[in-house]
């Protein structure tokens, strides 16, 4: 506990003002209440990625958050087929509890072969419940360490582009439930691009694991553990991070941050217009 708080204090001294708490399930951590309060007292905005199950029992901590983020793959049958029977209901109960506590709720939908036909149904649900949804494509790296076959779930590149052109068109029509910013929608409707996006990893952000290991990017391999904030101190660990991008990026909020950091203003503005693609019958959005 003391080591965690010391590391966070040192990172705050370096300028840390926004933290996204992930897991596993962060609400099961025995110090999550204290850590969240510690950060908020220092004017740090705290987002939390949770499965929603413990949200109704942790409302005192939930109310401190700037945003609650919950994965939802689609309607109940679609979500439960991937994550287990009853998981949709538990996620939605948690999302509603956070919303009713006054905390903004953002759903994350990983678009793949099993849920591509339910995107518009998910948007209708989110709009009715006053949630927003961030969409991003399924990639193999999302399934590392799990028993699920990422290759069987992800779409072909052309299918990804069609889906995100439809989402971009929906946002242009005023669909408030599409929470992606223009830069990630543009990125994914051209995905994968020949030209890699700018990458802020290791410059203005980093990923810290429970053992104190610091990584320039949480989306890449975490095998290299040469920068530990407990052993080295936060400044030395951060300054020693690798600073190199990758050929692509699939995480919507990271993509948006990267384009903003790189000053790609033309990618951040709404397009003049997007023609909605005609999907094959087997892929038609309901």
Feature annotation, model-predicted:
Residues 1-58, 279, 286:
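Conserved alpha-helical substructure of the radical SAM core
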Residues 42-45, 60, 66-67, 71-73, ...:
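Radical SAM enzyme [4Fe-4S]-AdoMet core and its adjacent flexible, acidic
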Residues 22, 71, 252:
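Conserved residues at the C-terminal ends of beta-strands
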Residues 194-198, 211-286:
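Flexible mid-to-C-terminal extensions adjoining Fe-S/redox cofactors in radical SAM and related proteins
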Residues 56-57, 78, 259:
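Glycine/Thr-rich phosphate-binding loops of Rossmann-like dinucleotide-binding domains
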């Amino acid at each position: 506990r003391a080591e965690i708080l010391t590391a966070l204090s040192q990172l705050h001294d370096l300028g840390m003002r926004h933290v996204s708490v992930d897991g596993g399930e962060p609400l099961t951590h025995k110090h999550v209440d204290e850590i969240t309060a510690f950060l908020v007292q220092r004017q740090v905005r705290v987002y939390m990625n949770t499965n929603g199950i413990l949200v109704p029992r942790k409302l005192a901590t939930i109310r401190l958050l700037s945003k609650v983020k919950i994965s939802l793959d689609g309607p109940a049958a679609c979500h439960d087929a991937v994550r287990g029977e009853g998981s949709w209901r538990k996620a939605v109960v948690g999302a509603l509890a956070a919303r009713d506590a006054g905390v903004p709720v953002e759903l994350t939908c990983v678009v793949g072969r099993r849920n591509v036909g339910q995107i518009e149904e998910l948007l209708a649900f989110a709009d009715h419940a006053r949630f927003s949804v961030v969409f991003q494509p399924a990639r193999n790296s999302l399934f590392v360490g799990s028993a699920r076959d990422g290759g069987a779930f992800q779409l072909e590149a052309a299918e990804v582009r069609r889906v995100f052109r439809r989402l971009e068109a929906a946002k242009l029509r005023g669909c408030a439930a599409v929470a992606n910013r223009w830069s990630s929608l543009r990125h994914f409707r051209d995905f994968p691009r020949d030209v890699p996006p700018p990458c802020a990893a290791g410059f203005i952000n980093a990923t810290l694991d429970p053992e104190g290991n610091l990584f320039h990017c949480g989306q890449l391999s975490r095998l290299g553990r040469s920068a530990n904030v407990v052993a080295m101190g936060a400044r030395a660990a951060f300054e020693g991070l690798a600073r190199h991008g990758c050929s692509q990026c699939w995480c919507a909020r990271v993509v948006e941050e990267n384009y903003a950091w790189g000053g790609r203003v033309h990618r951040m503005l709404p397009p003049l217009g997007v023609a909605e693609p005609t999907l094959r019958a087997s892929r038609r959005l309901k």
